[in-house]
Amino acid sequence: MSGKFINHKTIVFGVITSVLLLLLLIYYVFKPEAQTQNQNINTQTIQPENTVLESATANNKQGKLPTLAASLQGTEIDCPIQVDANGKLILTVGIRSCFDYFFSSLGEKTEAELVADIRQYLLATLPESASNYAIYLLDQYVAYMHALQNLKPNAGFKSNNVDALQKVVDQMAKVQQQFFNAAEINALFGNERNLNQFNLEQMRIHANKNLTTQEKATELAKLIDELPPALADGVRVSMQFAELQQLTKEIQAKGGSAQDLRSMRESLLGPEAADRLEKVDQEEAVWQTQVNQYLSARDQILKSDANDASKQQSIAELRNSSFGTKEDLLRAQSYEVMHDQKSKGS
């Protein structure tokens, strides 16, 4: 295994570095933390009936574990590898998580050292039948990562071109097929493939000028619902907030009405969430009026002929009488800073 190994979190394909980081980022954010649950998306066609799941170390006498790189020492080894009651390796994304955990310290240790560490860990924690297969997958994974370096973008490649990005993702899928069978691909790369495709479809929706903002919200909500349940929940929580901000800006830029905003929110989040957001809007409007009145009165104090000490005392009294809670007082002071900076810049 010659050549420099590129950590999966920082794959470099020349000019497409930023593209892959964009596409792979979501996978790492929403990657299931423990992988100890029965994951339908990764194990439903792999796990035999009546299989008893066991952690890699549950019923195995551990051998000598590798010495971790300095940055990993003190952390829990992220290797949620599972074996069945017969000591056979169960294919889950936890295998890949294990490999990536060790390779995240590339630079502190060489590729060869990290491969040796992973082998040592697998041999120490897995029964022989499982460790042999896991080591085979490790060798294939390293070879796969090396092969990714040979991918070349097409001439005129642009990172905001959805079709060009789709070709990159399709190329990656073809490379995976060179090193893994269908079950292995589903286990190791199933989440990533689903999330990459989700991201591309999301870009297509935003780029579609024939869709209204409400229609975009509806399509995005459908897109999230089409993800496997294990992924959809995490994506929904994080992505809906970002989409809400972007679609709100679109409506405001077009001079949309309050009803336009309401319709978009209902399509994206549902009526109950839309009700809550309207309440937040009303509370924010009241707050904005209150703080604007306070800042205006504060400006009058600052423009007065009183000495600095008297001004500060008057402002403190005004602030305390205008805002009734500690949180509002702190927030008001933050607005003061922004207001003063804006005044100096004008």
Curated annotation (Swiss-Prot):
Pfam families: Lipase_chap. Keywords: Cell inner membrane, Cell membrane, Chaperone, Lipid degradation, Lipid metabolism, Membrane, Transmembrane, Transmembrane helix. It is found in: Cell inner membrane. The keyword Metal-binding does not apply. It is a single-pass membrane protein. InterPro entries: Lipase_chaperone. GO terms for molecular function: unfolded protein binding. GO terms for cellular component: plasma membrane. May be involved in the folding of the extracellular lipase during its passage through the periplasm. Belongs to the lipase chaperone family. This is Lipase chaperone. The gene is lifO.
